């Protein structure tokens, strides 16, 4: 069975993004493939069959950046729907965002990330990030400051 194309899909794809924090920096990647090719983003990617979303979060951060993370915690679910010029849905992702603190490793772009680096919170506005990305980064910072996260059972 051929995998379904991500362009013009018949159903949304599940993706996991991770806000990785280290002191006053956040780990960002420059995307190496569509959608948002060449844009700055959070590390993350598609969930594999048989994999929990927490396992996906750990794997994707490690694959794309070489960084290991501590205990990823649920942050938010976001829909990313991108239409073409005719109004047809070209991409549709259901993004499950997590946040985690850095554990080890030096960022280095790999897999489908052209580049990976720590970026100061003060410089996020300069990078042209998607507005939802900035929102989840701020939410993760706030949760880290209060030392807790929403738990779902």
Predicted segments, located by residue:
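Active-site-adjacent beta-strand/loop module that shapes the phosphate/pyrophosphate-binding cleft
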Residues: 78-106
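Acidic, metal-coordinating catalytic segment for phosphate/diphosphate chemistry
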Residues: 1-17, 88
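A short coil-to-beta-strand element that immediately follows conserved catalytic motifs
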Residues: 68-77
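NUDIX/MutT-family hydrolases
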Residues: 97, 108-140
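Charged phosphate-binding loop/patch that engages nucleotide di/tri-phosphates or the phosphate backbone
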Residues: 133-153
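A cytosolic small-molecule/anion-sensing beta-strand core signal
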Residues: 22
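A structural signal for short, well-ordered beta-strand segments
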Residues: 18, 74, 98-100
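Conserved Nudix-box catalytic region and its N-terminal flanking loop in Nudix hydrolases
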Residues: 25-64
